[in-house]
Amino acid sequence: MTNGGAENMLVDIINYQVKHEDVSLLVVNDLYDESIFARLNKRCQVKMLKRDVGSKNPFVILRLNAYLLTHHFDIVHLHNVDMIKYLFVKCNYVRTVHNTNQIYHNYRWHKGIIAISDAVHDELLGQGIRNSIMIRNGVNFRLIKQRNDIHTNCVFRMVQVSRILFVQKGQDILVEALAKLKDKGIEHFHLDFIGTGPDMQKLQTLIYENGLEENITLLGNQPREFIYSHLCDYDLFIQPSRFEGFGLTVAEAMGAKIPVLVSENEGPIAIIDKGKYGFAFQNKSVDACAKQIEYVMNHYPSQKFIDDAYEHVTKLYNVEVTAQHYLDLYYKIVPIC
């Protein structure tokens, strides 16, 4: 339960569902963010197994299965792609598939498979999994502070929020794109990276090698409250992912009423409706990313464009709708008496 988009959304979903049903949360690894649990409704029962990350201790697996065996849950909802291979208690399993580029996984005993986007749903179909349903991810937009004015900063302020993981999130593409802008003499910009991850040291090195120490700040991991309060301070949100099943942070930025620039892949391009509500660049292309950043700097979108994007995203990706669709699926699997 780290401070990621899926984890934060899960807390929002639980907080909605505990109003209607008894909900428990089982956390396997001893890796969690206190700010996540601080937001969790106290009516949710939490069980911590405190497994060391990477541990193969069979006792943890036994405790996991014993917990399921003794509690007789009507639904067991999995959010981890590998979890089912450690479970030998037959239950009504539901799984949410949160990303693309996933290899085929075991779906034994599953009564429901949820794809978070059309891209994920299509990939599952390509793997021969035809019984998945699409339930869009959701955001609690009421908590996000909105920007009320058009770009006025002397320095063009950009932000990128995600796990620091080059192979998926593409932070290296963004840094190299900004280096190209600086080589052209464009220097009136600043980028904040929010998040941590396995490539943090590589990111620091890349920034230094490109002479961008004055233009880029690494803010590290920040609680969601901080992010939701400060997204509105920026002129542009950028998501340069190489692949992405959805892109929750893109929706959040649109909810803050700031323009977004995304790579042309899967989830993010669907959120902006293929460019109707945001800007896009060719996936994996440093040159295209740099070109689009410069374009937005010189052709900043109108307030109407930003307002239309806000209306689009808040209508389509409301977390209470997501949570209710989850409940509706559960009730189909286990009918209410």
Model-derived segments and spans:
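Conserved acidic donor-binding segment of nucleotide-sugar-dependent glycosyltransferases
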Residues: 274-275, 279-286, 295-300
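A short, well-ordered alpha-helix in the C-terminal region of glycosyltransferases
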Residues: 302-316, 325-328, 332
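Short hydrophobic beta-strand element within catalytic cores of glycosyltransferases
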Residues: 259-262
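Conserved donor-binding/catalytic core segment of Leloir-type glycosyltransferases
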Residues: 150-169, 175-178
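N-terminal strand-loop element at the rim of the active site
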Residues: 1-4, 8-56, 197-199
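Aromatic "clamp/platform" in nucleotide-sugar-dependent glycosyltransferases that forms part
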Residues: 242
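Carbohydrate-associated surface elements
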Residues: 119, 138
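Nucleotide-activated donor-binding/catalytic signature segment of Leloir-type glycosyltransferases, i.e.
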Residues: 204-222
